[in-house]
Regions:
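C-terminal hydrophobic helical "lid"/dimerization subdomain
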Residues: 3, 257-260, 303-347
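Glycine-rich beta-strand-centered segment in the early N-terminal region that forms part
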Residues: 25-42, 56-104, 138, 143-145
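Cysteine-cluster motifs in flexible loop/terminal segments that predominantly coordinate metals
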Residues: 45, 96-137
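Residue-level marker of beta-strand positions
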Residues: 71-73, 91, 131, 177, ...
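Mid-domain Rossmann-like dinucleotide-binding core that forms the NAD(H)/NADP(H) cofactor-binding site
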Residues: 137, 144-228, 232
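Glycine-rich cofactor phosphate-binding loops and adjacent beta1-alpha1 units
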Residues: 169-174, 212-291
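Residues in the short beta-alpha loop(s) of Rossmann-like NAD(P)-binding domains
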Residues: 208, 275, 298
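Rossmann-fold dehydrogenase core element
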Residues: 268-270, 280-320
Length: 347
């Protein structure tokens, strides 16, 4: 089969081609609950760039070469003898980790924290290929009118956006404000989910006017360019109190510092993006009683609930498609900020 492989890390992200498009052996089932999926679409994520940088090597054993791709959807091609929940030909989306306990606590709990299992695109070959080896516990059937090409990024970007919006909505009431930092692939999904789950007033900041146009089109109430003055505008809008909730999809030093600054006393700051440093005095944390929460992925139940929202038309996904053999261009465009919404590779 054809696949896009990472053979070496590039800490500076200055190399000409990060992935090699080549012929590799088809995946082979080894366990009775294994499933071979024919990939219909594989989302390209900012985390893929972090993997190429080697940023995850301190947190996970990554053996090269590896096929990246942790946002995957397609059709069941072959099933193991013990597989019961899907049949050959079923369209499916793949939860981004596998644990072999579809009916156990992993189906509802935070099983993305467990040590057992594997992570396609991280420590096992992922979906930047024509076929991928999966496990039955990862698979969720798609509604008949949703295609793998259009839904693949929901497997992680959508999952994460749903998780953080669900958690934030528990603290939101009419008249409350939520600041979303970053209106891109995750941000435009989070805006829609927040509107479906809460009555919060949504403020969005981004450095790109095009991204802010996307934010407005999916329901943002207020948008500001992420310049040196946007915190003043947010404080003016909120009568100097600040916002009840911040959801930061950027995670750089400047976004964290400014986001915490406009979080009101007793407010919640959800950190999804990463790459920067979180620095705040312990006295300030005590005095302000702010809560800072890191968010990683979501549960299998989150993915089910998100798909129900998409099926009902409450959430729509904006995508740009590339052929699999153009994976390097897709990654380069993502790095350079030329894509809005989510990027999908099509084998």
């Amino acid at each position: 089969m054809k696949a896009a492989l990472l053979h070496q890390f590039d800490k500076s992200l200055n190399g000409p081609d990060w992935l090699s498009y080549e012929d590799v052996s088809d995946p082979v089932m080894e366990e009775p609950t294994d499933v071979i999926v024919r990939i219909g679409g594989a989302g390209v994520c900012g985390t893929d760039l972090k993997l190429i940088e080697g940023l995850w090597c301190d947190h996970m054993r990554i053996e090269l070469p590896i096929i990246l791709g942790h946002e995957n959807a397609g059709w069941v091609e072959e099933i193991g003898v013990a597989v019961e929940s899907v049949q050959v030909g079923d369209p499916v989306i793949l939860y981004p980790t596998a644990y072999g306990d579809l009916e156990g606590s992993g189906a509802t709990g935070s099983h993305h924290f467990r040590k057992r299992g594997f992570y396609p695109g991280f420590n096992r070959n992922g979906g930047f290929a024509e076929y991928m080896l999966a496990e039955e516990s990862m698979l969720l059937k798609l509604p008949s009118h949703l295609s793998p090409m259009d839904t693949a990024p929901l497997a992680d970007a959508g999952l994460t956006a749903y998780n953080v919006a669900r958690r934030a909505s528990k603290h939101l009431a009419p008249g409350h404000y939520t600041l979303v930092i970053g209106a891109g692939g995750l941000g435009h999904l989070c805006i829609q989910i927040l509107r479906a789950l809460s009555s919060t007033e949504i403020i969005v900041v981004d450095k790109s006017e095009t991204a802010l146009d996307l934010a407005r089109s999916v329901g943002a109430h207020y948008t500001f360019v992420a310049d040196e003055h946007y915190t003043e505008k947010i404080l003016a809008l909120t009568s100097g109190k600040g916002v009840e909730t911040v959801i930061d999809f950027v995670g750089k030093d400047s976004s964290v510092n400014k986001g915490l600054f406009v979080t009101r006393r007793g407010g919640h700051y959800y950190l999804v993006g990463y790459g920067g440093r979180l620095t705040i005095s312990t006295l300030e944390m005590i005095r302000s009683e702010k809560t800072v929460v890191g968010v990683l992925g979501g549960t299998f139940s989150d993915l089910k609930e998100l798909l129900t929202m998409v099926d009902r038309g409450l959430v729509t996904l904006t995508t740009r498609e590339y052929a699999l053999n153009n994976a390097n261009k897709a990654l380069r465009d993502l790095k350079d900020g030329r894509n809005y919404g989510r990027t999908v590779l099509i084998p």
